[in-house]
Amino acid sequence: TIDINLQNAVQEELESTIEKFSADSGVSLLINIKNGEILSLNNFPDFNPNRINLSNTNGRFNRALQANYEMGSTFKPITVAMGIDENIINKEMLFDVSKPINSIRDYHPFIGSLSVKDIVVQSSNIGAAKIAYKIGKKKQIEFFRKIGFFEKVNIQIKEAAPPLGNKNNWGKLETMTIGFGHGFAVTP
């Protein structure tokens, strides 16, 4: 389902962005949200399969399918969706985010409380951690299982990496840190 024109345009943009930010590597993945088809999958550095003997292993590593990444703050909306899906929270609820929880802090500290919406908009780790704790480990695991987070990506490439994370044995702190995208890693 790769669209070669889109693939080439995205590859050029990826290379340009990597150069602009002096990055060592990068990956892009465009998916049709209606049916899950992969429209473009790009890696940099890459290699010419017709001249594989001239490439190094770094160029042959498929970062889109073989590497796992912690999702970080991009995971906060999933935590909120989980809480709403389980009828544990609603968008009007407020959470006090004024004090750190153990080692969990916000990059920009907040005074008082934030709504569920503002926890996502303002990217509050403390707020996402509190929502995740309210959801609880059991429901968190059930939700992850339901959406396939414990499964290897269902793609016809044998090198696809399975998710990383101790899916059967995490405690209170892990439940909270997973709420803002740390402690669990998946392929893009």
Whereabouts are the PLM-identified features?
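Beta-lactam-recognizing serine transpeptidase/beta-lactamase-like catalytic domain environment
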Residues: 2, 26-73, 78-188
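Conserved, well-ordered alpha-helix/loop/beta-strand core segments that scaffold catalytic motifs
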Residues: 1-26
